[in-house]
């Protein structure tokens, strides 16, 4: 037996340091990353829908929305309560607040003391990565789902009631969270202490929320439309593709070196031999994983998401807990990890961001656990504490490189135009001159032709920025956002006869992309009355 003492990682000074790091990094992201860039697609998606609600429209009646409603309502509340000059910047701060909160809550479920704050720090940095800060239904769903997981650890009936309500709120954000109901049911069943009492309280809260929501739909004659719009958003084949098959899509350039690095690690876990080699190989692989993303981003010179890297780490987490699940060994200990990994998986079932990167806490913990186990087996060469800080610094540096290429905008270093000088709602937001010219073009056209206008196919927050009433039942007019049913759009087009501003950015896609059916019909049949650097203005709709 070695007489090397295991160091105490829960020293008060070190614990305070990680707490300070957590809050400092979150504040730093709000100040350093939130003000830069703006886009005309995802960035205003929920804002546009919320603006429709605030203009007196009703979801599923005169607003087309193929997801459950909660995120739209939450964004409407934000617009109501945030000062106008803080509407978009505040939205981004709230995004970072949500990611920080669910990263900490997930860490609180999985760890204690200093380790909890370490996990929260790494969980936040990796989950936030270079994702564009904005109101988003997936982020809301994760927050409520992790809150449900957090409150299920309580033995008190009220907390379990809250947990059931939180889970229903997660399901009201996005359909991909529906599988959480059986997952969390299994989790509660595996908790032997006061099992049936806890299940009763939890599902009591869930059932109460369910009854209240569907009673609202029934009383407002929205139930049929709600079921029709939300049930056709994705096919079984799409769910299988994004929920299962996509996890095997890992580029060979990353997969093959990973196999070489991880062979010594697998050999130690199987045979218990050469732990020092395994620890060195594992540590080098982690740094190589981070470096590979930095290198790919810099080579592409464009916004890049860590798709393959996140899938590899998800597989690491699955491999870590799967043997215990299959043998029903230490179920009480591994079930929280299983539950949170389920949340990460549900969040990744998506049309666009179909990889487990928005909630990374469970697979970050898996990486920390592998490191801890290998350290314990290699005591003579234990890595010092700065190892964790070096990894944190490498992550922060890597994501700074990634943030240089702002999502669907330009380079951060070239963004020196204050967008608040064009629209007050964009106060505190900076972009480059090209983007500023686009927004100036919109403002001039809205002044000339407004207030009855619509941008196509995107620019979902155009009516919000110009403070005009949206004439269409949705703002991002693509077939996937209508389930291919454009009846309400054509109805509003005939009745309200808005002037249409078609974005030239989509000129190469209008003729061929089946998603742009409405834009293509209008562009082909309507009369172009004016052309600006960024838009075609069309009128005289005859469909």
Stretches with model-predicted labels:
Residues 13, 180-211, 226, 231-240, ...:
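Perimembrane helix-loop-helix junctions
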Residues 66, 181, 403-480, 498-509, ...:
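Short periplasmic/luminal acceptor-recognition loop of GT-C membrane glycosyltransferases, typified by
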Residues 175-190, 259-260, 356-360:
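Transmembrane-embedded, aromatic-rich helix segments that form part
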Residues 93-114:
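Transmembrane-helix motifs of polytopic, lipid-linked glycan transferases
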Residues 131-142:
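Short acidic/glycine- and proline-prone juxtamembrane loop motifs at membrane-interface regions
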Residues 34-49, 60-77, 85-86, 220-222, ...:
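Extracytoplasmic catalytic/substrate-binding loops of multi-pass membrane glycan-assembly enzymes
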Residues 140-167, 315-320:
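Specific aromatic-rich, kink-prone transmembrane helix
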Residues 128-129, 159-175, 180-187, 207-208, ...:
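Membrane-interface alpha helices of multi-pass inner-membrane proteins
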